[in-house]
Amino acid sequence: MKYKIIGFTCCFAVILIAVFAPLFYKDYRKTERIHQHEQEIPQEPCTDPADGGLCTYLPIVKIDTDGVVIPGRPIKDDGNNRIYTRAADGETTIAAQMDIIGNDSKEYHHANETADVSSAIRIRMRGNSSREFDKPSYAIRLVDKKGENNPLSIMGMDAHHEWVLYGPWLDKTAIRNYMFYNLAGEMMSYAPNVRFCEVILNGEYEGLYVMTEMITGGKDGARLGLRVNAKHSTFSGYLLRLDHQNAGEEALNSFTTYTYKTPFLLQIEYPGSRNRDARLTEEIRQDFSNFEKTLYSYDYDREKHGYTSMIDVDSFVDYFIINELSSNADAGNYSTYIYKGTDNLYHMCVWDFNNACNNYFEEELPYTGFFLNNRLWFEMLIKDEDFTERIIQRYHSLRKGLLSEESLYRYIDETLDFIAPALARNDARWGSVEQQAKGLLVPVSRNLDSRSAAEGQLKGYLRNRGKWLDENIETLRQYSASSRVKQYNEVND
């Protein structure tokens, strides 16, 4: 298998035999997972500041755009196509200042205190359907005075330069992303770090947000180690995203795209467009196509030349389990990240559980049945008996501990208790849960009118889904039964 050496200064790429890449492999398991809600809540009452401003034990994020409107709101062009607003200079982001108070504090603090962390930023609205919500989410890049990446440790998370301020809106519990990212982080070698915080934008309180580590690679403080400097060269992997194709983004025409195995499109997230030329883009396309061709070939499960030599199998197994348990309807279609690490293997990475656990826009999702067995890449993996058995055994193990009903319920209860004061302030800013719902979910009856109802819905779905999977997880063997996949498994070594 070939691998890349990326020379960013000269913007060229040459081929290196992959056997050398593991010598520089970064083990991202060394970072201990922090679950913010496990910190002790201060027992003494908060001393309100003289100006009556915000007092909280969550970090406070203050953003000042100097009155400039943040771009990225969806609008229609003359052809009735969906486009996004831009800044006055035509850019997709604007310059702003971000200050964080109580960056890693576990005590009460006030909005008028001195910031613990400060940085210039570039900011825009982000998301697909979520850009339509009253409460937007934001993409943030920390920059220095020269406009270069400025990785900083935020809220006790590893230093990074790209962050998402996710504003829960559709999820009335406000904890889906926080909970499932953290659970995935206990299962998998990498999952985005997350922290709850409260946001003040241009002096106005904007409510409860989740500061989220953006999935990116590179040398600039990225915990996802896709680039390692050697003596004379730079070894690099790459990161791809399967999603809607956004205007201005070039799709990667890989094997499953040009053979019409998926209507969704891949984009290269890393290396960024500024750090790759047409030659490097083509090499990534060919390299990933080779993986897909292997996976979709008749000898896909052979030990010598099959998929197992190309992927971190555990990563794909855990991705399957956590997305099936949560019925995360987007997984394998939208917001789906896959990366090739410096270990020369492909890994899956979780992202976006906003629609999970029957919180999907367009229809009510049953708690029965599997869905990832029909999604890209997994539709082939599930044909392999060894892969299916690993899912079954891993699932049973996780249900005895981390993903047991008792453990999940406790996680929900403790997290909701932790953010309760901030949720109350959030609702004072945005109106009652019933007002926020606005019939976004179909049918209308699914638009819950209280936080307690949302909690009950989340717990109820996980209980029913978990019970069904407990009783039916072993039926996954039907997808790898020899009578069903004989045409794929007839090739001998």
Regions found by a protein language model. Give the residues of each.
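Short, solvent-exposed loop/turn and secondary-structure capping segments
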Residues: 73-75, 110-111, 151-153, 176-177, ...
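A conserved hydrophobic secondary-structure block that centers on an alpha-helix together
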Residues: 143, 152-208, 279, 289-311
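Middle-to-C-terminal accessory/interaction subdomains
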Residues: 26, 71, 269-332, 340-493
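Conserved oxyanion/phosphate-binding beta-strand-loop segments in alpha/beta enzyme cores
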Residues: 100, 107-167
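Structural recognition of the beta-strand scaffold that forms the well-ordered cores
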Residues: 138-141, 161-167, 174, 198, ...
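Regulatory N- and C-terminal appendages and interdomain linkers associated
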Residues: 2-119, 406, 410-413, 417-493
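Internal "kinase-insert"/substrate-recognition segments embedded within catalytic cores
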Residues: 146-147, 189-190, 205-318
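Carboxylate/His-rich catalytic cores and anion/metal-binding grooves
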Residues: 113-138, 200-201, 222, 229-244, ...
